[in-house]
Structure formats: C-alpha cells, structure tokens
Design a protein with these regions (language model features):
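N-terminal Rossmann-like NAD(P) cofactor-binding subdomain of oxidoreductases
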Residues: 2-138
Length: 138
C-alpha cells in the first residue's frame, strides 16, 4: 500500500470543515489524510465547529484537543493560526497538497506565495480570478 497523500487545509470555515468531513466519511480516507489546518480562529472554536454542524449534524467520530492539535478519532491534526500563507512552514509539515479554502487567494501572484513557502501543490476550493491564474481546472 502506498503512503497516504498528506493534505493541509488553509481556511477552516464552512468549506474547509465540509472538506474534512467529506474526506473523513469517504472510503478514500486511507489514501488521503489531513495532517494540518491553518485557521486564525481559536482552537476551541475549531473543535466545536467541527463537532457540531447545524446542517450536517454531529461529526461522526470523536473530536478532541491536545495541545495545538485537533484529534479526530485519535489522529492528530496540527493547527496553526497564521493569516498569511508565507507564515506557515508548509515544507516542515511534510504535506503533499494544500487545499485553499479561505477564498482570500485567487490570483497567480497570491497563490505563488504558498509555493514560495514550501507548498508543493495547491488546490483551490473556489474559482480563480481567471484561467491564466491556474495551471489546470478540475
């Protein structure tokens, strides 16, 4: 079995939380794992909003906190509270992909800030400003 793809989520609002939930409930989760979340909100709020969702109900697994980590079924997810992509050391996190869910970054120069900070690949959860701002649309 190959190593799971290590994913970080940047922006943990509605879209970031739905992405984590969908991945957690998917049979693909043995191939894809969230190892980091970057979100300015307080860690306690992140845990609470993960556990209780007004649309989707309770999270289907145990949600807890340990230090600066969110634990989902005992699996640790590192949490940072940076407000700019270059403030996160993506390379040190050992991630393979950042899923950009904040909606704040939509132009090529803005997105290249992630790459310059050590992010090997970036997937947007929202449309880029133009086709010229991204390498591919999936």
């Amino acid at each position: 079995m190959t190593k799971p793809l290590r994913i970080a989520i940047n922006g943990y609002g509605r879209i970031g939380r739905c992405f984590l939930r969908a991945l957690h409930e998917s049979p693909c989760r043995e191939h894809l794992t969230v190892v980091a979340i970057n979100e300015p909100a307080a860690l306690e709020s992140i845990a609470y909003l993960t556990q209780f969702d007004s649309t989707h109900g309770r999270f289907p697994s145990t949600v807890a906190l340990q230090g600066q980590q969110l634990l989902i079924d005992g699996q640790a997810i590192a949490v940072s509270h940076e407000t700019t992509p270059e403030a996160v050391n993506w390379k040190a996190l050992g991630i393979d992909l950042v899923v950009e869910c904040s909606g704040h970054y939509s132009t090529r120069p803005e997105l290249e800030r992630f790459i310059a900070a050590g992010c090997p690949r970036l997937l947007l959860s929202h449309p880029a400003n133009s086709a010229a701002d991204v390498d591919a649309t999936i």
